[in-house]
């Protein structure tokens, strides 16, 4: 929770800094430079990468075994292998959101900045790789335990 509160504070500060810079450029009549900045995707792309990196880190902190447990639901030859430095890829991120209770494809699409159709396609593609029933797949993803739940269950059995 603290991580996301800090992240919100950082984003508010960045927004305020950006607002002040825009105001300064308007006051100085630097419209061309301002237009160039507004048309650039660099700030957006950097912010999105940071958001997804923070999401991936926080999610895997709560569900450290998620990738392994998710792969257990897939046929061995269809398991997801992450690239070096990658915490989650798009497929895993979609199902991480589902694990968190965000099931609506339009909400997932909005967060990941894809079309709803693309999210449907990813979901269908992954379900087709499953070694379990397609109908049960998402319910089984929702049952992947968090570290705190697993930790609590271990203490209950003692």
What is the meaning of each model-derived region?
Residues 1-86, 90:
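Membrane-proximal linker segments that couple transmembrane helices to downstream signaling/catalytic modules
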Residues 49, 53-149:
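Cytosolic nucleotide-binding catalytic cores of signal-transduction proteins
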Residues 150-157:
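Conserved small/polar residues in nucleotide/adenosyl-binding loops
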